[in-house]
Amino acid sequence: MEIKFNYKKSKRKLKKEVEKYVLCSMIIFKQTQIKFDKDFILSEPIGHAPPNTEELSFLQSFNKVVNSLSREGREVFIRSFLLNESDIKIGGILNFSEFSIRDRRKEAMKSVSILLGCAEFERSDKKLTLQN
């Protein structure tokens, strides 16, 4: 029996987490613009000292997970999921093909969804066989 990452279900759940992230940001900071620096490290807006709430805790956890990706992974993830840019546009900016961006997006999405606990896996009935 083989266990495989379910891309479609995980992407759906991750998009809900991204929507929650944007909503929490709006509630706490009263703005929809996501803050990140030139290295695509997510951060809280400067000059805000929000109370310690469940929303703030979620924002900080989300930022920590995304910021744990490589610089390239962060940029692809933020541009794809938070800024909703197309693979073609991201590829033009980073000088990669659309297909290369798609592969990088999938890898970043898989890492983030696993770390946030929203990844879905499925079992296949394929039997693994070893060949000599």
Model-derived features: positions:
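Cytosolic nucleotide-binding catalytic cores of signal-transduction proteins
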Residues: S80
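N-terminal interaction/assembly modules
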Residues: M1-V65, F121-N132
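Short, Lys/Arg-enriched C-terminal cap helix and immediately downstream tail that follows
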Residues: M109-D125
